[in-house]
Amino acid sequence: MFQIAVLCVVFGLWLGVFDLALLAFSAPALRSLAGFPAKARATGIFVVRFLPLTLAAAITLGIFVPAWWVHEPENAEEALTLAQAAAAFVAFAPLGEGLRRAMRMASRTHTRLVDWRRRGQKSGLAASCPFDVVEVYGEGVALCVGGYFKPTIFASIAAMKVLTMRERRAALAHESSHASSLDPLRLLGMEACPDFLRLLSVDAEWRSAFARAVEFAADARASAGDRGTALDLAQALVKVARLGLAAPLKGLSVAPAMSNSVDLKARVDALANGPMDEDRRLPLSSGWALVLVCAAVCVLGTQESETAQRLTEAIVALLR
């Protein structure tokens, strides 16, 4: 128990350091990411937002845990002090709060999806779409994607009726992009990110930037560089918005076709008048970036294990 508590404190300290760094550089980081094409912007925001958690976990597991295992005597038994227990609790608080937020949002989302399925029927539109499409009777939904690992497109019957075939195809392509990118799951992750920034609710600009970015990214993928398809999607968005069918989706991890009127105007303008999004990706995929970070941490851990152990012992002494 003592060893676990101390390593939790180490993790919490690193998480706090990286969270402070991200908080300090949030504005320039978001400005820099805004310069990326729409298709890469959302992924960039997501990766940077989770960077403090990733680095803190990698350093703790890749450096401090092995150092403790190698250098701590097997017969070393120390009692857990009140200060150490309190510090471990504070360090673990972001993880606990993140889990609580995720479970609450997932529960609310599940309840809403069950209601939509109860009021809906599987659509014949699914034949031209790689994902299941459920057409829903009544209000409360216009066009959105729900589900984490097996996403489903939910569409209002009234919304589908007002769209032409080309507009319907473009709208479903937009939602299919959300589904293929697992945007509901990523939105859940952004809402429940287990770090101090989310615990203290000082990450609102990152969450709003990501929510906007996934919509622009889905627009860009749906239009696929074709101006005609982009115009069809713009017309579909305007028509569906005018119906006013969608209920507020705040607190739900679903990817709607439109979130608010301001973003809708900007998206329609980008689709109708903006340049087609160039096919430029991030310099490095998130997967390879994670591999490189872990490799660098492992190399550093073999070289600085004694330093890491001294830091751990200093933390233990400070909290006695």
Regions found by a protein language model. Name each.
Residues 21-22, 26-27, 32, 107-120, ...:
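Short helix/loop segments within enzyme catalytic domains
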Residues 29-53, 108-130:
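Membrane-interface amphipathic/juxtamembrane segments adjacent to transmembrane helices
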Residues 1-3, 16, 88-108, 121-124, ...:
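Cytosolic-facing loops and C-terminal tails of multi-pass membrane proteins
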Residues 1-34, 220:
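Membrane-anchoring/interfacial helices and their immediately flanking loops
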Residues 125-151:
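Catalytic zinc-binding patch centered on the HExxH motif and its immediate surroundings
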Residues 44, 155, 159-160, 166-194, ...:
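Active-site recognition of the HExxH zinc-binding catalytic motif
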Residues 49-118:
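Transmembrane alpha-helices and immediately adjacent membrane-cytoplasm interface residues
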Residues 2, 6, 33, 57-76, ...:
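Juxtamembrane "helix exit" motif at the C-terminal ends of alpha-helical transmembrane segments
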